[in-house]
Amino acid sequence: MAKAAVTKRHHFMIQKLLILLSYGYTNGLDDAHSLRCNLTIKDPTPADPLWYEAKCFVGEILILHLSNINKTMTSGDPGETANATEVKKCLTQPLKNLCQKLRNKVSNTKVDTHKTNGYPHLQVTMIYPQSQGRTPSATWEFNISDSYFFTFYTENMSWRSANDESGVIMNKWKDDGEFVKQLKFLIHECSQKMDEFLKQSKEKPRSTSRSPSITQLTSTSPLPPPSHSTSKKGFISVGLIFISLLFAFAFAM
């Protein structure tokens, strides 16, 4: 019994390290040269009628904020450029449509209610790095109630889940052709405008601080395909956590 408890603790520790590994890697991708959109889908209540919210950032700058309550576009930059305005116009309707689709999918997804504590709470992060001459691509991270995690890479149209339970849900979502088309369409439709805006943002002085994405601290999604570029900071984080994993496995033996 004691041995089983120790093993369970080791497995829990390893799971947390894997979460940090995902955070460290993705944080290397998520900087002022990337556009990040955080989407939240939840069950509305009479006290809080909010059921969807979408926020898009470049670095620390909020360039777009949408919800079913506040449908106006906002920006954290008083000196907003024409490129920023074009990006917002391009993203607004596709994001609204996607949030409605996500709401329908969550409502029709069977989950363990003990894990989700009722209606599933969905968090989605889209990260679009500046294409720099490559085929425009993005990473979509899905987090259902901090219990089910999977990722979609538009670059090679691949899906990866954190575990078997997440894989069951992921496989149903990936088989929805209309849904996948929406994820791809948003990137294809707005890639040129996003690249122009990111190029302009890259030339501006920026803060070195970063805020984690909506799913980064909880997502256990696997590493992106090797063709994605990473910063030195991302590699350092991966290296340190890999060493920690080795120690964790050693103690678990």
UniProtKB/Swiss-Prot annotation:
This is Retinoic acid early-inducible protein 1-beta. GO terms for molecular function: natural killer cell lectin-like receptor binding. Glycosylated. Residues 230-253 form a propeptide. A lipid is attached at S229 (GPI-anchor amidated serine). One of its GO terms (cellular component) is external side of plasma membrane. GO terms for biological process: cellular response to exogenous dsRNA; cellular response to lipopolysaccharide; defense response to bacterium; positive regulation of immune response to tumor cell; positive regulation of macrophage activation; positive regulation of natural killer cell activation; positive regulation of nitric oxide biosynthetic process; positive regulation of type II interferon production. Residues 1-28 form the signal peptide. Keywords: Cell membrane, Disulfide bond, Glycoprotein, GPI-anchor, Lipoprotein, Membrane, Signal. It is a lipid-anchor; GPI-anchor.
